[in-house]
Amino acid sequence: MLLLQQKQTEALGTQPIGKLLLRLAAPAVAAQIINLLYNLVDRMYIGHIAPTDTVGRVALTGVGVCLPLIMIISAFAALAGQGAAPRASIYLGKGETDKAEEVLGNATSALVFLSVVLTAVFYIFAEPMLLAFGANDGTGGTDNTLLYGFEYLRLYSLGTLFVLVTLGLNTFISAQGFTVTSMLTVLIGAVCNIILDPIFIFGLDMGVRGAALATILSQAVSMIWILKFLTGKKTTIRIRLRYLKPNWSVLLPSLALGLSPFIMMATESLIAVCFNTSLRKYGVDLAVGAMTILSSVMQFSMLPLQGLTQGAQPIISYNYGAGNADRVRHAFRLQV
């Protein structure tokens, strides 16, 4: 089994680039579509919370105010995960599996540490952050979007560990060339979320808290799937206890490489905050909810590009480590 998995990873340096890019990018695009669709379904359920249409509208707006904060969680996952995964691919290209596993172990520790810090910050300061990010407390005749945003964010923050580890470590599965397995991570979480959403939101009458609980439990299932894979026999590199101890000479270069996607995602969060606060000031709370839906629809245009980038990353990193400059240039040209 191990030999088979090694051959699949080594294919990054031997198979024709065009065929390889298509094989890796197609599952990545599918994963992006699945992720977006289940987010849309999640918001559809929230928008139909009883007893009145107004409640659903205000609840959707309240959750929409939480989205910039959730983007920040994703940004930290990118800082530790997207920065470290390419370095692991480079070491695999060099044939240095132990160093690739050390990168993986340090990234895992960083993700756990960041999740503890973010959980504390989001749980303790949920209310002032939501007010700063565009929520209303119901004074002056406005809708109380803070109530729904607070309920959602406080519960969601308790699952930060599941979200960070899932987002951060799934990149290491793709980095080895196992993009189908990476896609299954997203699919498993999406199916669980779609099943649990109506049960918690409507069946147990939990409202937005039910949506948050469904999300974090789904991410927990995805995290278990990832950890089972990265500690099992089907992976080329494994999470090993001896590499969980932070080594700054390994961790800092990974964080430096992850700084770029972190800044990009943090900037998206800032833009969303600007939209929310401007819409609240010059429009009505309904406009914030409408923007929440519109932003989800707009993401469809980015899916092919994101999938292609995710498919090309392990090819470029692996061949860079192996010293195959021609294959690196070829993959880059095809991607562009």
What are the residue ranges of the model-derived segments?
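Structural signal for membrane-spanning alpha-helices in multi-pass inner-membrane proteins
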Residues: 122, 171, 197, 201, ...
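Small-residue-rich hydrophobic transmembrane alpha-helices
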Residues: 60-120, 163-182, 290-336
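Hydrophobic transmembrane alpha-helices of multi-pass small-molecule transporters
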Residues: 72, 193-197, 223-227, 300-303
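Short runs within selected transmembrane alpha-helices of multi-pass transporters and secretion channels
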Residues: 31, 81, 156-174, 182-190, ...
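Helix-terminus/linker motif at the lipid-water interface of multi-pass membrane proteins
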Residues: 33, 37-60, 130-143, 199-205, ...
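Residue-level hotspots within the lipid-embedded alpha helices of multi-pass solute transporters
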Residues: 32-36, 75, 115, 119, ...
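Short alpha-helical transmembrane segments in multi-pass integral membrane proteins
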Residues: 1-28, 88-161, 203-258, 316-336
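Signature of the first transmembrane helix
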Residues: 19-85, 89, 256-279
